[in-house]
């Protein structure tokens, strides 16, 4: 499908996830009246794409804006550079302009829950554990078929490779929106292991790398191409990453703890993915990208009784130069490896 009419084009990775669907719904709900919107749904499987588009189309019809919203899709895997290269070819062919890229990448490699630790931590350190759970067990040493750390490639390197290859489509006002996390912290990254191969919490480490890579690339993108990069976080919400390890009783208990945490004042407890999508969509639809705080991480928040809010967190970006240089080196190497493919 080649899109010629004037429309705001938004590409969402991980669009079939709970948060991805919520972002799509909020884009439909909050777009300007009579404005045209093209949502490009991406996933690794055709089944997930079909479900996502069917859900979003039904939402657009229910909101009586069906004719004003178009859908397209791409199938690719952020843990496969050949797949990424194919997606880049398709994006360049279909779209002369991309207004926003939303990277909702969420490769975590969870393999279970440490239940004794969970019970101890939730009993003795409830606030810190509910916001930053230490009981989730992640696989260590997982590499992609390309030989990179899986979480690093899927959440950090693959997305940045795409951004740097799509500067022509994004230039002069395009936005890149990163879904970071409140769990991001410098303690989860060792600069001697940037690919997170030996990291016991590669998901949290990848979110920290997203933050510092943004700090490295954001000024360059803006100065050289007029592209704006933003860090956002969706707070805490129900997602499938942990739910698959819960039975009906533990899932109910999780919901109770989330609502209790919100009642005692933890505004990060969005719970509903739709509330988590608040800030990413607000940034997407903002008409003055230069006015937004790009040096902060902008977070979706919810008050005790469900009122939506926004939070801006000033971050420390130690390691930005090292991480940025490492990504740059990888980008150069993969451009050389992929140069003989169609582009």
From Swiss-Prot:
Q: Which organism is it from?
A: Yarrowia lipolytica (strain CLIB 122 / E 150)
GO cellular-component terms in the record?
A: endoplasmic reticulum membrane; lipid droplet
Q: Does the keyword NADP apply?
A: yes
Keyword Oxidoreductase present in the record's keywords: the answer is: yes
Q: Name one Pfam family in it.
A: adh_short
**Keyword set, alphabetical order:** Lipid biosynthesis, Lipid metabolism, NADP, Oxidoreductase, Steroid biosynthesis
**Gene Ontology BP terms:** ergosterol biosynthetic process
Look up the coiled coil feature and give its residue ranges: none
- Name the residues that bind NADP(+): 19, 42, 203, 207, 239
Q: Which Gene3D superfamilies match?
A: NAD(P)-binding Rossmann-like Domain
InterPro entries registered for this protein in UniProt: Ergosterol_Biosynth_ERG27, NAD(P)-bd_dom_sf, SDR_fam
The UniProt entry annotates the active site at: 180, 203, 207
Q: What is its EC number?
A: 1.1.1.270
Mind telling me what this protein is named?
A: 3-keto-steroid reductase
Q: In which pathway does it act?
A: Steroid biosynthesis; zymosterol biosynthesis; zymosterol from lanosterol: step 5/6
| Superkingdom of origin | Eukaryota
| Family classification | Belongs to the short-chain dehydrogenases/reductases (SDR) family. ERG27 subfamily.
- Which reactions is this enzyme annotated as catalysing? a 3beta-hydroxysteroid + NADP(+) = a 3-oxosteroid + NADPH + H(+)
Which GO molecular function, any one, fits this protein according to its record? 3-beta-hydroxysteroid 3-dehydrogenase (NADP+) activity
């Amino acid at each position: 499908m080649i899109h010629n009419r004037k429309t705001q084009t938004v590409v969402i990775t991980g669009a079939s996830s709970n948060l991805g669907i919520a972002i799509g719904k909020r884009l439909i709900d909050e777009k300007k009246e009579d404005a045209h919107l093209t949502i490009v749904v991406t996933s690794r499987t055709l089944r997930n794409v079909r479900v996502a588009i069917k859900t979003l189309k039904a939402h657009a019809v229910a909101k009586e804006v069906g004719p004003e919203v178009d859908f397209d899709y791409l199938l690719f895997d952020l843990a496969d550079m050949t797949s990424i290269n194919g997606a880049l070819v398709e994006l360049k062919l279909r779209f002369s302009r991309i207004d926003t890229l939303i990277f909702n990448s969420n490769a975590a490699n969870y393999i279970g829950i440490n239940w004794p630790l969970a019970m101890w931590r939730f009993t003795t350190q409830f606030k810190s554990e509910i916001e930053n759970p230490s009981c989730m067990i992640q696989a260590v040493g997982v590499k992609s078929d390309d030989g990179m750390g899986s979480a690093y490639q899927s959440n950090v390197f693959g997305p940045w490779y795409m951004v740097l290859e799509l500067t022509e489509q994004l230039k002069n006002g395009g936005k890149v929106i990163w879904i970071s996390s409140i769990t991001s912290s410098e303690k989860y990254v060792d600069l001697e292991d940037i690919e997170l191969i030996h990291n016991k919490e590669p998901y949290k480490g990848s979110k920290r790398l997203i933050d510092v890579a943004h700090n490295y690339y954001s000024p360059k993108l803006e100065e050289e191409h007029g592209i704006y990069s933003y860090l956002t976080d969706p707070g805490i919400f129900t997602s499938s990453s942990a739910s698959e390890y819960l039975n009906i009783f533990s899932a109910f208990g999780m919901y109770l703890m989330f609502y209790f945490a919100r009642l005692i004042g933890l505004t990060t407890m969005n719970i509903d993915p739709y509330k988590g999508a608040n800030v990413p969509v607000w940034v997407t639809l903002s008409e003055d990208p230069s006015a937004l705080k790009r040096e902060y991480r902008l977070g979706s928040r919810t008050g005790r009784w469900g009122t939506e809010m926004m939070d801006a967190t000033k971050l420390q970006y130690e390691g930005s130069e090292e991480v940025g240089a490492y990504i740059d080196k990888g980008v150069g190497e993969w451009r050389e490896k992929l140069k003989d493919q169609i582009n």
